[in-house]
Amino acid sequence: MQKQIFFSFVLVMMLLGKVKAQHNNPFGNALIPDMIADASIQEINGVFYCYATTDGYGQGLKTSGPPVVWKSKDFVHWSFDGTYFPSAAKEKYWAPSKAIFANGKYYIYPTINGYMYPAVADKPEGPFKLARGKDEFYKPFTPSTLLQSKNPGGIDAEIFVDDDGQAYVFWGRRHVAKLNEDMITVDSVVQVISTPRKEYSEGPIFFKRKGIYYYLYTIGGDEKYQYAYVMSRVSPMGPFEAPEQDIISTTNYERGIFGPGHGCVFHLEGTDNYYFAYLEFGRRSTNRQTYVNQLKFNEDGTIRPVELTMDGVGALKKVKSDKKIKIDTVYASSIEVPLKIEPMKDPTCLRTEYFVPSFAVDGANGSRWMSAAEDSINPWIVADLGTVKK
């Protein structure tokens, strides 16, 4: 009898362990409740804007989602309203950069069908249109490209405006050039930034803090994505020097964070609080999400390696919000089978995503409920609020 009780106890504990495993969320609390990458985040007139590549369309680099800008007043609650670049809505749209205010207009520099284009609008939420020529796209390219080249020439534009008003454009493979005053043409002198690490690089980040210019560049890719940096005390075009500890983000095996790559650095206006946004390997290929952690500096101005987490940084501003209602139970018409995510370069990157109903209301943007494939006509989900409370 005691053996039977012991066996039953072990069986129950095994089942409880299985249930617990099924509720594991390997993707934590992403910034946005969507699959986005290559984020450029900025604060404009007290509102946070997040321009990014929309992922999750299941065809790798062959396609992308439409141009969408997410907005938030507190950095926690995000929303969007349609597409901000109508003519580019059906194109392959990547890495739109920050919106730069100049000449009474807002400019962005997305990579569209493999080419960088300047686009312009009256407001940061658009609608944007090509800054020169007809506002239309055709392949292989439209002659309104930033670099005015028949060859793709570069991707992932990053715009920096120095204190004297001079604008610079950085792009993949360590390139930099001055932008002319019209903000849509590039100075003929193009430089390649010398860095100690020579691997393929994209997703540049550039900013200035306390008189020091920082150039961040990616190396590797997929689960092996990393960010390294060099710094200059002279100008945005160098000369640059590499600190002894030049890697600021890399895979954190203990926390299950793989390939922290193309993102941005931003800071709160009027403060010295800096933040590092990065994409994470996610669900393999172009099915990524974006996370944000604090960026900290040493006394000599060098950057400390980022303490990567998937917890988020919480609210960056206080705004009045609705009272949260506690949910007692959540159940649904069906649950999609778990998704096993296979690694690409790192065999230790083994993940399983579950789609249980409770994930719809857990407050984490990295989890979700999905109905079973055969339940696609009229799926439903119910949140039980429990007994009536006054």
Model-derived features: positions:
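Bacterial Sec-dependent N-terminal signal peptides
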Residues: 1-23
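Beta-rich carbohydrate-recognition and catalytic domains
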Residues: 22-199, 208-255, 269-272, 279-319
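Signature of short aromatic-glycine-proline-rich micro-motifs recurring in repeat-based ectodomains
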Residues: 97-98, 259-265
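Conserved structural scaffold segments of CAZyme catalytic domains across common CAZy folds
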Residues: 21-29, 362, 375-377
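Disordered, acidic Ser/Thr/Pro-rich linker "stalks" and the adjacent N-terminal cap
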Residues: 314-389
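N-terminal non-cleavable signal-anchor helices
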Residues: 11-13, 20, 45, 357, ...
